[in-house]
């Protein structure tokens, strides 16, 4: 079974690498690629059994004809062609990091970015990253106070090249002695890692999900949580014991993990898939993972925004919003993480459909956000489920954010438990992969305020255009569905690559969030997890020495994380053993 799984995953990956040619390109592709040689010493005839396996997979599981698959196999991947398309769109673009020192600077920068319709990549209490064309830099600086005109550093000056580098490279998917084998994968013991050495388009992700559900039907079910504006299903994998196996008068505890709300955040989609795969293949082999899938249903949504995700592969790699029309036909799209009903603040942005943060004209106008909300309500109201955990994966800046996002003046009733678990999640990342993730309220991670006096006027810079605010999925699940543990996790890195994180970081980032999920589930199991002989730490995934290097950031870690880093030698399970949250009394 393991050998068959490896073959099927390799086939999925090899088909996916050639399906990502941007549509409408005028570039002539190179000559057809020769069929992949699985073993260089074998003749063509000796490979016929593998061809039959491939054809069976294509025809029986994916519904793709042999002729169609052959047509796809001779097309060139994006990186096999010259990057003229990216150069045309992004040739003069750069990413600058502005360092904020006071509220006046933050407000001036926010106003300038609104006037010039600039793309704010991320914002924290210390800096704001902005993408803009080089020729626009003088105009931006002219709108800023003198103190900000020299308070910036260039992060990315070769944006077009970095965009192209994120697309898959056409390499033979063979054994480690074959040409094109990636040396960093030699130590991997997981066949699935071959699938995760590149980002994958939706045309590969959906068949892969279908394959997982077919091969692991005892604990995996493929579902869809809605339909996008352009008519695509929003696919998801449900992991856990089959419903109805045992009579259970209590609602089934469910944890939802979502990625890809913002189309350009490819690492979030790949990370959701990696974590799902790790749980799927460890069920029945790992007592810890088996326990998690027996105690909870896990619903993994790789991309909530399939229309936008497809658009990033076919047209614009840095597209953020969904693809539904607005009042301005040349500015389509709604920010799905501002479109939720709770504390929707579209009054600030609905007059500007060209804004990257456009919230629509009314709550839930964003189709995909409304679809997920309807699915979640249906699960809790009619399907005997209680959503007890919500993890919303984004990029970038390495932050673990808890409610509320809309305002720092409103304190969540379970604040201590949220902080406790959030610090525990950051700690397990630091101990296993040595990466530092900040832990704070979402309002502070995106529109920063004084974290010592939540009800007093903000003392640190406020930048109101970055990240979430009102209308976020995080706040809606926590407040409307009473999901006790809801987090938005911003993945790697801290700005060296931003949304263009190289594919060699997929597996290390996936390991970090797998460890987060393992720790998250252990915490929700509660005291019962401590009263067993299971060694939860033994199941944690650690970064191998030859894997991708640590993420590079700009500047030192925030003071709060320096305190956490000094706490490495504390008892690692103390935060779980002392937990007495409302969750376990409900």
Curated annotation (Swiss-Prot):
Residue runs in coiled coils: none
Residues forming the propeptide are 21-170
Record-linked SUPFAM superfamilies = Protease propeptides/inhibitors, Zn-dependent exopeptidases
What Pfam families has UniProt attached to this entry?
A: Peptidase_M14
Q: Where located? A: Vacuole; Secreted
Cystine connections: 331-354
Q: What is this protein called?
A: Inactive metallocarboxypeptidase ecm14
């Amino acid at each position: 079974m393991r050998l068959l799984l490896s073959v099927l995953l390799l086939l999925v990956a090899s088909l996916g690498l050639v399906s990502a040619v941007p549509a409408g390109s005028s570039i002539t592709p190179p000559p057809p690629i020769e069929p992949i040689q699985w073993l260089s010493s074998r003749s063509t005839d000796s490979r016929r059994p593998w061809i039959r396996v491939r054809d069976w997979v294509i025809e029986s599981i994916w519904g793709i004809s042999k002729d169609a698959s052959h047509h796809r196999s001779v097309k060139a991947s994006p990186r096999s062609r010259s990057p003229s398309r990216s150069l045309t769109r992004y040739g003069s673009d750069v990413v600058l990091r502005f360092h904020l020192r006071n509220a006046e600077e933050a407000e001036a920068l926010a106003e300038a970015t609104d006037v010039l319709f600039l793309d704010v990549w991320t914002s924290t209490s210390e800096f704001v990253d902005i993408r803009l064309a080089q020729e626009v830099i003088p105009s931006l600086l002219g709108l800023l106070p003198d103190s900000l005109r020299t308070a910036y550093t260039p992060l990315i000056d070769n944006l077009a090249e970095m965009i192209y580098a994120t697309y898959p490279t056409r390499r033979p998917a063979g054994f480690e002695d074959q040409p094109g084998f990636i040396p960093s994968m030699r130590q991997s013991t997981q066949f699935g890692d071959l699938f995760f050495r590149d980002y994958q388009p939706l045309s590969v992700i959906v068949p892969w999900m279908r394959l997982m559900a077919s091969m692991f039907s005892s604990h995996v079910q493929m579902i869809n949580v809605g339909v996008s504006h352009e008519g695509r299903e929003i696919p998801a994998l449900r992991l856990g014991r089959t419903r109805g196996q045992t009579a259970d008068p209590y609602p089934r505890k469910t944890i939802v993990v979502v990625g890809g709300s913002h189309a350009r955040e490819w690492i979030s989609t790949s990370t959701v898939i990696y974590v799902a795969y790790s749980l799927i293949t460890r069920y029945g082999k790992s007592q810890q993972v088996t326990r998690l899938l027996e105690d909870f249903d896990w619903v993994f949504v790789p991309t909530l925004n399939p229309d936008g995700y497809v658009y990033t592969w076919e047209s614009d790699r840095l597209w953020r919003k969904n693809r539904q029309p607005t009042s301005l036909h040349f500015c389509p799209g709604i920010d799905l993480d501002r479109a939720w009903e709770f504390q929707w603040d579209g009054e600030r942005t609905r007059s500007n459909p060209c804004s990257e943060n456009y919230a629509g004209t009314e709550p839930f106008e964003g189709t995909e956000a409304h679809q997920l909300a309807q699915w979640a309500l249906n699960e809790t109201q009619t399907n005997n489920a209680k959503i007890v955990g919500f993890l919303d994966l984004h990029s970038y800046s390495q932050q673990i954010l808890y409610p509320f996002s809309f305002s720092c003046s409103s304190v969540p009733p379970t604040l201590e438990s949220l902080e406790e678990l959030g610090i525990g999640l950051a700690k397990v990342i630091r101990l296993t992969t040595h990466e530092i993730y900040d832990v704070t309220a979402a309002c502070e991670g995106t529109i920063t305020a004084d974290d010592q006096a939540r009800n007093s006027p903000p003392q640190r810079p406020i930048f109101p255009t970055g990240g979430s605010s009102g209308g976020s999925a995080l706040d809606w699940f926590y407040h409307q569905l009473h999901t006790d543990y809801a987090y938005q996790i911003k993945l790697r890195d801290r700005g060296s690559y931003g949304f263009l994180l190289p594919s060699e970081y997929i597996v290390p980032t996936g390991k970090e969030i797998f460890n987060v999920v393992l720790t998250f589930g252990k915490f929700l199991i509660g005291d019962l997890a401590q009263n067993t002989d299971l060694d939860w730490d033994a199941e944690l995934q650690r970064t191998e020495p030859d894997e991708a290097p640590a993420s590079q950031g700009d500047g030192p870690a925030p003071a709060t994380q320096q305190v956490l880093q000094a706490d490495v030698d504390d008892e690692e399970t103390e935060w779980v053993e002392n937990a007495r949250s409302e969750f376990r009394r409900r």
